[in-house]
Amino acid sequence: MAKNYYDITLALAGVCQAARLVQQLAHQGHCDSDALHVSLNSIIDLDPESTLAVFGGSEANLRLGLETLLGVLNTSSRQGLNAELTRYTLSLMVLERKLAASKGAMDTLGNRIAGLHRQLEHFDLQSETLLSAMAGIYVDVISPLGPRIQVTGSPAVLQSPQVQAKVRSALLAGIRAAVLWHQVGGGRLQLMFSRNRLVNQAKQILAHLTPEL
């Protein structure tokens, strides 16, 4: 069966978007708020109609992730910040495979996300309450699967409990996107052998987005 590289690229962009948000938060203490909302919302939607629906039904919602994906797949730019993004992206993929192999962790994750739905009836998605709850899910369910993702950035920034909660929430969104990536036919071998197809697909999607003003 032919693989759907459109869906695979969207899901991979979701992983890369989460990685970019983690990087922005760790270095600056803040990030692209709209992109964060899209990524966090993807955690909540467990019964989407399509891959694109996971990310709010609009390709533009993944602009940051698609641009990051092109940087990660550009092998000539594996220095500095791009090396960080590549490490985060690959680490999220490794953790997702460990999650998939643990039925207990998957069941717990589903139950905890159902709890987020109840909290959303009373609190906003980016409220401290929800961010703390999502960070707690990452710490309790994902981190023990190991190996832990080493987040690098400004030590002063990373000491902030609010930044820590956002970083862990973004990592949870990255895991969600990595789960989706495998569901639609993604796999690690594509990063080696189908790199050009992924790059071309990402460029095609970006090309017909309206330019940012």
Swiss-Prot record:
Gene3D superfamilies from the UniProt entry: HflD-like
Cellular-component GO terms for this entry: cytoplasm; plasma membrane
Keyword Cell inner membrane part of the UniProt annotation: yes
Subcellular location, principal: cytoplasm
Sorted UniProt keywords: Cell inner membrane, Cell membrane, Cytoplasm, Membrane
HAMAP family: HflD_protein
Name of the protein: High frequency lysogenization protein HflD homolog
Gene of this entry: hflD
